[in-house]
Regions:
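Short, flexible, mixed-charge glycine/proline-rich loop motifs
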Residues: 36, 55-66, 77-81
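Cysteine-rich micro-motifs
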Residues: 81-93
Length: 103
């Protein structure tokens, strides 16, 4: 998981997902297969989840689209080419668009 997302919401995501897996009695069998960024949003691959667990992950996918990938602050820009959300302070030089024009 990129540092900014880990800082911005990573712990909260894990706590919510853990509570759901404990509620469903699946915590001991649950395995995370991969966590990454793709097209500017969170991708989380696992060994199987509950419907409510997938709802939690979908919520954080949406949050990731508007969270700076570097620092965890609210994103204001999306870079072109390699699509990633950034705040004004972290946005690299080069082409980018305001986030509200992208989504």
């Amino acid at each position: 998981m990129p540092d900014g997302w880990r800082i911005g919401f990573g712990e909260q995501l894990c706590e919510e997902l853990k509570a759901e897996l404990e509620r469903a009695g699946l915590l001991d069998q649950y395995r995370i297969l991969q966590i990454k960024e793709k097209y500017g949003s969170l991708r989380w691959y696992d060994s199987g989840n509950t419907s409510a667990g997938y709802d939690i992950l979908e919520k954080y996918e949406r949050i990731s689209e508007r969270t700076c990938i570097c620092c965890g602050m609210p994103a204001t820009r999306i870079t072109s080419g390699w699509i990633s959300p950034y705040c004004d302070a972290c946005c690299p030089e080069g082409p980018s668009v305001p986030i509200d024009e992208y989504y």
